Amino acid sequence: TTTADIGMDLLRQVPGIAFGPSVVSWQALVQAFGQAAEAFQDPTTQEYLTMSPMTISSGEFGNLLNPQDKEMVDMLVNLWDGKGFRKVTKHSGSDDVVNPWINIIACTTPAWIAGNFPEYMIGGGFTSRCVFVYADKKERFVAYPKHAMPPNKAEKKQRLVADLEHIASR
């Protein structure tokens, strides 16, 4: 979680990135995607198109996703595939997700995955859309991280943010 938070703190400094909630129901996520819709100009055709981009960060994957909620899992698979989504309710009207673009970084443990991922999450395609990063040991133990920081830390952070801005502008 600490490492993910460092990266997300850098990304939050980049203008134009839409961040979603870290704890959400699938219905609220559809609503958030609808609100995140924005227009962009296709550099090839000069045509204006709509997209619904969202970046979600969750310090605990289990807070973001209930693996037993098949509707949420199926909706995430559809969103990752770039499929549009329309939700219509009797009292709340409708929410449209056009050209979704979803990025999720969520932290958990191998034990949580083993104990909570049912077979359909693996066979149904959810895990094939995920990149699992795992380390079985710490690279180094640092009791007081502030004492181990390089003197040019602020400059390095600025350069990383500038790189992220460059990537986001493409």
Residue ranges, per PLM feature:
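Phosphate-handling catalytic cores of nucleic-acid transaction enzymes
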Residues: 1-170
